[in-house]
Amino acid sequence: MSDINATRLPLFFPPDFRPPCVGDADNFTLTRGENLC
């Protein structure tokens, strides 16, 4: 995993973690928290 992906995610979410409420799985790495429940 790139550190860039880790920095875009909240610190309490592991790089491999995908919130079940996020509808845009393709945009997961681009999620800034707006799509998180």
From Swiss-Prot:
Keyword Nucleus: no
Tissue and organ distribution: Expressed in basidiocarps.
Propeptide: 1-10, 21-37
Cyclopeptide (Leu-Pro) cross-link, renumbered residues: L11-P20
The UniProt record lists the keyword Repressor: no
Record PTM text: Processed by the macrocyclase-peptidase enzyme POPB to yield a toxic cyclic decapeptide. POPB first removes 10 residues from the N-terminus. Conformational trapping of the remaining peptide forces the enzyme to release this intermediate rather than proceed to macrocyclization. The enzyme rebinds the remaining peptide in a different conformation and catalyzes macrocyclization of the N-terminal 10 residues.
Any one GO MF annotation of this record: toxin activity
Keyword list, A-Z: Toxin
Biological role stated in the UniProt entry: Probable toxin that belongs to the MSDIN-like toxin family responsible for a large number of food poisoning cases and deaths.
Alphabetical list of NCBIfam families matching this protein: amanitin
Family named by the database record: Belongs to the MSDIN fungal toxin family.
Protein's UniProt name: MSDIN-like toxin proprotein 5
Organism this protein belongs to: Amanita exitialis
